[in-house]
């Protein structure tokens, strides 16, 4: 049985982690385009 606190923590951290990775990848991609790098 999963504790509600742990479940809430995971449900809160997962979207933030995915959003952070997406933003980091987007910024790196955008920076690469500005430098004309493939």
Swiss-Prot record:
GO terms for cellular component: cytochrome b6f complex; plasma membrane-derived thylakoid membrane. The chain crosses the membrane at residues 5-25. Keywords: Electron transport, Membrane, Photosynthesis, Thylakoid, Transmembrane, Transmembrane helix, Transport. It comes from the Bacteria. Its main location: membrane. Signal peptide: none annotated. It holds the Pfam family PetG. InterPro entries: Cyt_6/f_cplx_su5, Cyt_6/f_cplx_su5_sf. SUPFAM superfamilies: PetG subunit of the cytochrome b6f complex. It is found in: Cellular thylakoid membrane. It is a single-pass membrane protein. Belongs to the PetG family. The 4 large subunits of the cytochrome b6-f complex are cytochrome b6, subunit IV (17 kDa polypeptide, PetD), cytochrome f and the Rieske protein, while the 4 small subunits are PetG, PetL, PetM and PetN. The complex functions as a dimer. This is Cytochrome b6-f complex subunit 5. It comes from Gloeothece citriformis (strain PCC 7424) (Cyanothece sp. (strain PCC 7424)). The gene is petG.
